[in-house]
Structures are given as C-alpha cells and as structure tokens.
Amino acid sequence: MKDIATPNRTKDIVEKYGFSFKKSLGQNFLIDTNVLNRIVDHAEIGSESGAIEIGPGIGALTEQLAKRAKKVVAFEIDQRLLPILDETLAPYGNVTVINKDVLKADVHEVFSEQFEEGQDVMVVANLPYYITTPILFKLLEEKLPVRGFVVMMQKEVGDRLAAKPGTKEYGSLSIAIQYYTEVETVMTVPRTVFVPQPNVDSAIIRLLKRPKPVVEVTDEIFFFEVVRASFAQRRKTLMNNLSNNLNGFPKDKELLDRILTEVGIDPKRRGETLSIEEFATLSNALVLHKLS
C-alpha cells in the first residue's frame, strides 16, 4: 500500500469519503513523504518512544510516526475524519485517535492513560495555523512531561519563535517560547506540498524543553507582564510602554527611570532591543515595587 502522503493516495481518500476541507479548521493535508520523514527524524522517535499528534487529518504524519514509535496518540477535533482514520491507520495497532479539542482536553489525564511512566514522548504535529500559539502555550504552561516538540507551522510564526533581539520578528512570543525551550528552525516547507494549497509557506520548528527556564525570575507571572507591557506599542520607548501598560505597578515615571538606570538599561531603549536576560533582571528589580 502506498504511503498516505502522496498526491494520488490523498486524492483517492478525499474522493472516496466525499471529504470537504474546512477552512475554519485550517485543514491542509501534506502530500510529500520526504517532508514527513524530516519531521519524524528531527523528533528522534525510537522504538520505545511515544508521540502526541494534534490534527492528524487523514493520517499522513500519523502513519510515519506509527512505523517508528511504540505508541501514537492523535487528537482530532473533526468527527468527519474518524472513519477515514479508522481505515488509513488500520494496519497500525499502536495508534489511539481521540476525538477532542486538545485545547479543552485534560492532557495530563490522557498522557497518564496512554503512556508509560518515564516514557520518552514528543509532540509531533502539523499544527493548524489558527491555533498554533495557544496549543504550544497550553502544553508548556501545563508542564506536560514531554521532551519537546517538532511542529510544522506558518513560517511567519516560526520566524517569531526563533527571533533574536533587535529584529522585527522579535517580540513577547519569542521570549515566552525561548524561556521554556531551545528553538531550532529545521527547514522551510513550500506551500506547494499541501492540498489544498495554503496562502503562505510553512516551517518545521523543533523546540526542546529546557530542564529549567533559561533565566531565573522572582515572579514568573509578573515577568511575562513586564515583557508584554514592553512590547505593547513597538515604536514607544521602554519607559513609555511600562508606565502606560504595566498593571499592578505604580504610575511613577521617576521610580521607573531610577530602576531602569540602576539595572543598566537606558529608559529610552525599545522593548525589542532587550535580551531575555535583561528582561529577567528588569522584572526582578520592578517586582520589589509592585503594588500588592
């Protein structure tokens, strides 16, 4: 049997079931086995590994994962795909498809039911563009015990995850993801290898979870509030953004100026020029003056 991720097999499956693509669910099926193999290779899935997939579609990536992993768990929100997955994944007894929205699912419960304690597990997925960021944050903030993520996403989002200070792509998303993970751009994927063809190119991004966050902060929630406030209006200075947008902090420019100067940060700088280490230093200094 041909792999699912070929133009002809994908076309046959879609036509057999009269499947119509839902734009609202970001459904674009990959039809290039080489790209799928690059994804699975970079996930370093072995015979004892587990994999969590989100949005399996008709099972193209799921199939490649099932060939290598001990166990694959796939979350699929679209009920119309369940009978298709039953057929396409029938040769693989190590796959469980869960008909749930991963954003609403109790992922810890699923994890403990489906995987062995201490098992090496990776999240490997071609993520729907419209919910890429919420999915990553849910799994990171809930501290799911996975080794990391190898995910396909809109190239523009991938560029933001990997961005360095001083670039136009660098922002609060870059800092939040890099706080938890080491980010690597594996490859750019052209729009031409999808059916239907999306309007933008994609990127495969590998995120390996850090044993502990890259910087030490006194108050994690406040740290991210400082970061978000600093990027609220990109053209404004750090001083203006923090004085106007940092909730729970005195509206006192003199105090802000003093703290920024004390930690060696020019109040006239813009948020996009600060490294994650500088944000940690700033947050740890500001938190001492936070309103209770």
Swiss-Prot record:
InterPro entries registered for this protein in UniProt: KsgA/Erm, rRNA_Ade_diMease-like_C, rRNA_Ade_Mease_Trfase_CS, rRNA_Ade_methylase_Trfase_N, rRNA_adenine_dimethylase, SAM-dependent_MTases_sf
Record's keyword annotation contains S-adenosyl-L-methionine: yes
Reaction(s) catalysed by this chain's protein: adenosine(1518)/adenosine(1519) in 16S rRNA + 4 S-adenosyl-L-methionine = N(6)-dimethyladenosine(1518)/N(6)-dimethyladenosine(1519) in 16S rRNA + 4 S-adenosyl-L-homocysteine + 4 H(+)
EC number: 2.1.1.182
Main location: cytoplasm
Binding, S-adenosyl-L-methionine: N28, L30, G55, E76, D101, N126
Cited Gene3D superfamilies: Ribosomal RNA adenine dimethylase-like, domain 2, Vaccinia Virus protein VP39
Claim: Metal-binding is one of the keywords in the record: no
One term of GO molecular function: 16S rRNA (adenine(1518)-N(6)/adenine(1519)-N(6))-dimethyltransferase activity
Any single Gene Ontology cellular-component annotation: cytosol
Function: Specifically dimethylates two adjacent adenosines (A1518 and A1519) in the loop of a conserved hairpin near the 3'-end of 16S rRNA in the 30S particle. May play a critical role in biogenesis of 30S subunits.
Family classification: Belongs to the class I-like SAM-binding methyltransferase superfamily. rRNA adenine N(6)-methyltransferase family. RsmA subfamily.
Full protein name: Ribosomal RNA small subunit methyltransferase A
Species the sequence originates in: Bacillus thuringiensis (strain Al Hakam)
Gene that this polypeptide is encoded by: rsmA
